């Protein structure tokens, strides 16, 4: 009640909140409204974001970014995210062990999306999947960090060509460059002829320093960690969860771009399970639109 004597600090904090349709919202410094969540909703949201169907087991800071990015708020977000992250058994079991001080990476940057891709092979994987897959072929776009990947039973030049055509060219256009290691499937005459015919320049990293293809190496680590966390109880079904792992990777905040690959590719945020469950301002607005409003 404004007529009552209230401490100045409380009055100031109250100006940051607004009630719309019986829902409490927090107004950011940019004027964006974030729906305020109670304790139960906050715990449920953290669980979905961290380890749900499209959760990528991200750090506390990235969890906070995802929560606010998707339109939610409560006063102790970061503190609660740290508690949840530190209590996650999957993160404790499969998280990185830092043996040396972290140093800044210098990623290759292309001036346009999908003009340069890094391709690498994960495997041989043990145990193989229940369908006999032993490898994962991974491609990462240098600009957006978008990742494409498929499981493979065997590695051939024909498989590489089909992958480039179906998962890169047919979806994103012909790239300028593809960076690979010195694997025979990439250096074969068949693959070289295909690349020349498409006008693609194939760059090979040194066999003595495969880490030169750093973008592919980084993507591989991320995909492997996601798969391990999702298939702990049944390792032989990893091929069925690869697309789920890719979804998690594409929706996660990337360290170098500070946004998700999905947002860079499509220009907006995807509607994810937690937003459907908790509800959001944008979904409410979309539900009220008529066919004329969409025009």
What are these regions (language model features)?
Residues 1-131, 138-144, 150, 249, ...:
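RNase H-like DDE catalytic core and adjacent DNA/metal-binding regions
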Residues 45-48, 121, 135, 159-164, ...:
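Well-ordered alpha-helical segments embedded in enzymatic catalytic cores
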Residues 56, 88, 116, 146, ...:
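Domain-scale segment recognizer with a strong primary affinity
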Residues 62-73, 180-184, 208-211:
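Conserved short loop/turn motifs at secondary-structure junctions
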Residues 125-128, 151-156, 211, 233-237:
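Short, contiguous acidic/charged loop-to-helix segments that flank catalytic cores in large enzymes
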Residues 129-133, 258-259:
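Short glycine/proline-enriched turns and hinge-like loops at secondary-structure junctions
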Residues 149-170:
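Active-site beta-loop-alpha junctions of metal-dependent nucleic acid enzymes
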Residues 151, 177-181:
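Short catalytic-loop micro-motif centered on adjacent basic/acidic residues
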């Amino acid at each position: 009640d404004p007529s009552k004597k209230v401490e100045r600090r409380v009055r100031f904090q109250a100006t940051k909140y607004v009630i719309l349709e019986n829902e409490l919202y927090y107004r950011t410094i940019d004027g964006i409204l974030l729906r305020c969540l109670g304790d139960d909703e906050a715990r449920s949201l953290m669980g979905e974001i961290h380890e749900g169907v499209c959760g990528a087991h991200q750090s506390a800071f990235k969890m906070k970014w995802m929560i606010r990015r998707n339109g939610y708020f409560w006063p102790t977000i970061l503190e609660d995210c740290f508690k949840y992250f530190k209590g996650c058994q999957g993160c404790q079991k499969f998280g990185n062990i830092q043996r040396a001080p972290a140093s800044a990476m210098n990623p290759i940057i292309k001036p346009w999306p999908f003009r340069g891709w890094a391709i690498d092979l994960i495997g041989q994987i043990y145990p193989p999947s229940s369908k006999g897959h032993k490898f994962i072929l991974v491609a990462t776009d240098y600009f957006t960090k978008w990742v494409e990947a498929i499981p493979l039973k065997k590695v051939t030049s024909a498989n590489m060509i089909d992958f480039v055509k179906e998962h890169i060219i047919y979806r994103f256009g012909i790239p300028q460059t593809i960076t690979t290691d010195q694997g025979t499937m990439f250096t074969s005459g068949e693959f070289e002829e295909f690349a020349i015919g498409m006008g693609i320049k194939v760059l090979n990293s040194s066999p003595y320093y495969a880490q030169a293809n750093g973008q592919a190496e980084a993507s591989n680590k991320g995909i492997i960690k996601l798969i391990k966390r999702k298939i702990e109880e049944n390792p032989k079904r990893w091929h069925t969860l690869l697309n789920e792992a890719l979804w998690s990777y594409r929706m996660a905040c990337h360290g170098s771009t500070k946004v998700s690959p999905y947002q860079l590719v499509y220009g907006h945020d995807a509607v994810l399970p937690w937003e459907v469950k908790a509800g959001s301002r944008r979904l409410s607005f979309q539900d009220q639109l008529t066919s004329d409003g969409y025009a």
